[in-house]
Design a protein with these regions (language model features):
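Patatin-like phospholipase
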Residues: 1-45, 53-286
Length: 286
């Protein structure tokens, strides 16, 4: 069994679209047990990269920060009001949407805290920051760090296949980090770390002879992508990974249909259960 202890020195946050709000609940609860400073690095994939960047730049998970992040987790803030008439154009562009709206959302999130993220690189963060994307040119994951512009790295890590146009950076093609890195802990060479995954349950869809006939091409591609990443994740995740979920909440859910406080509370409770199972809550009482 892998030995874990508080405080954690490294943090990994996995992808999961709208489910990223679960990261917030777990981190808010963790902040009651240790300072959210990770000297060995913050690693993020997709939406986990967004929250990891927020954290690595020293922005607080206080009430104001939680409120701002909650507001950003509406699906329309990422993709807008999708006009499905543009699906035909997506076959030539390899995606329905540019990432302009996504970029504007990130800029607004940081500007509200006094940071012009447009001028920042990953190396400007208050702690080591690593953002993971899927490099289609090389056919393997790429870990961005150092002098890579924050916005470029985030767009590469969050470019969901079929939804967003693939991103070109340094002459190479990138899509969502989840494709090649469904379990971020595989890229973190530390024992004293915590990884949080949003892949405990990814879909309730059953693809059968009957259901496949009525599925849209977009739903079909999305569900296959979901199954691939979940199966890969289940094969490679380690004992250092906390897996979170909330009933009915998926990567493409409308967050307005949920009680966000309930989601945050469950994530915090699941973190405590995880720490308790590892014997870490006892350490806090000594």
């Amino acid at each position: 069994m892998i030995r874990m202890s508080l405080p954690f020195r490294a943090l990994g946050l996995g992808g999961g679209g709208v489910k990223g709000i679960l990261h917030m609940g777990a981190l808010y609860e963790l902040s009651k047990k240790q300072e959210l400073v990770f000297p060995d690095g913050v690693y993020g994939v997709s939406v986990g990269a967004v929250i990891g960047t927020y954290l690595a730049f020293g922005l607080p998970f206080d009430d104001e920060g939680i409120l701002k992040l909650k507001q950003q987790f509406k699906l329309t803030n990422f993709v807008g009001n999708v006009d499905f008439n543009c699906i035909s154009h997506s076959f030539s562009l390899k995606g329905m949407l540019t990432m302009d709206l996504f970029e504007a959302m990130i800029v607004d999130l940081f500007e509200s805290r006094g940071i012009d993220i447009r001028t920042k690189t990953l190396g400007d963060a208050n702690m080591p920051l690593f953002i993971i994307s899927s490099n289609l040119t090389k056919g393997k994951p790429t870990i961005f760090s150092g002098n890579v512009p924050v916005l470029d790295a985030l767009k590469c890590s969050c470019a969901i296949p079929g939804i967003f146009v693939p991103q070109i950076l340094y002459g190479q093609v990138y899509i969502d980090g989840d494709m090649f890195c469904p379990s971020v802990d595989k890229f973190m060479p530390f024992d004293n770390m915590l990884c949080i995954s949003l892949k405990k349950k990814m879909t309730d869809i059953k693809i059968t002879e009957q259901t496949i006939e009525n599925m849209s091409p977009l739903s079909y591609i999305h569900d296959i992508y979901t199954m691939i990443t979940q199966n890969f994740h289940n094969q490679v995740k380690s004992e250092k990974t906390l897996c979170l979920n909330f009933p009915g909440l998926s990567s493409m859910s409308d967050i307005d249909e949920f009680n966000v406080d309930d989601i945050l509370t469950k994530a915090g409770s699941d973190l405590n259960s995880f720490l308790g199972a590892k014997g870490l809550l006892q350490e806090l009482t000594k």
